[in-house]
Amino acid sequence: MSAARLSARYNPVAPKSLAESIGRALEGIEAARLDDLTPEVRGPGIYALYYVGPCVYYEPLSTLNKEAMRAGLGPIAPIYVGKAMPEGQRSRKVELEDLDALLEKPILHKRLSEHLASIERVDNLLPEHFFARALVLAPVWVRLGESLLIQHYEPVWNHAVTGFGIHNPGKNRPQKRSEWDTLHRGRAETWSVPLKPGKPKEAIIEKIEAHWQGWRDRVLDTLSPERRRLLEGRL
C-alpha cells in the first residue's frame, strides 16, 4: 500500500473543517420547537431554524427534515441560519467582554423571539412547523460561525430568498418589499410605512426551484457516515 493511502492532509482551521466542526456541535443539540423556547436560551451565538410544514415552496426541505426526525436524527436541513450579537457588537469592548457575563443576557432568545413574531404575522406559515437549535459562542466567533454554516448548509432563506431577518425599516427609510415578504404576506403590512413593490413573485419562485437542484445530495454530504446511513434507508 502506498504512503498516499496511509495519510491525508488535514487543516483544522480550514473553512471546510471549521464548518464541519461547528455543524457537528449544532447537530448534537436537541432541536426545540420555535414557539416553545424558554428564556434560558441565553448568550450570544448562532442558530439554525428548521421547517417541517406544508408550504409548497419548501417541500423538498420539509420532506427531508420529517424523514430525518422519523429516523431519530432530528431535523437536519436548516431553512435559515443566523446570528445573535450583543448590542454594541462593533465595539472592541464588547468583543473582549467576558463570555460569562454575556451568558446572563437573553441575546439568542431575543433574536429567536423576533423570528417567531415574523412567522406569526404571515398568512402561509405556522410557528408549530419550525424547530430551532442554538449554539452559544464568544462574540469574536459569531460572524465567522454564521458565515461558515450558511456555506455548509445552503439554507434557502439565506441563499435564494432574501429578507427574513430584516427589521421594520421605519418611517424615514422607505424601501422595496423583500423577497421573503413577497412570498409571505402579513409581516410587512404591520410596518410603519407601505413598501414599494419588490421582485415579482414568479421570479422568486424560479430562484427557489433552481436552489433545489442537487440540494438534497449536498445536504446529505454534510452528515457523518453513520447519520447518513440511518437516513438513506428511509429515502
What is each model feature region?
Residues 1-79, 83-235:
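Boundary/linker segments flanking structured domains
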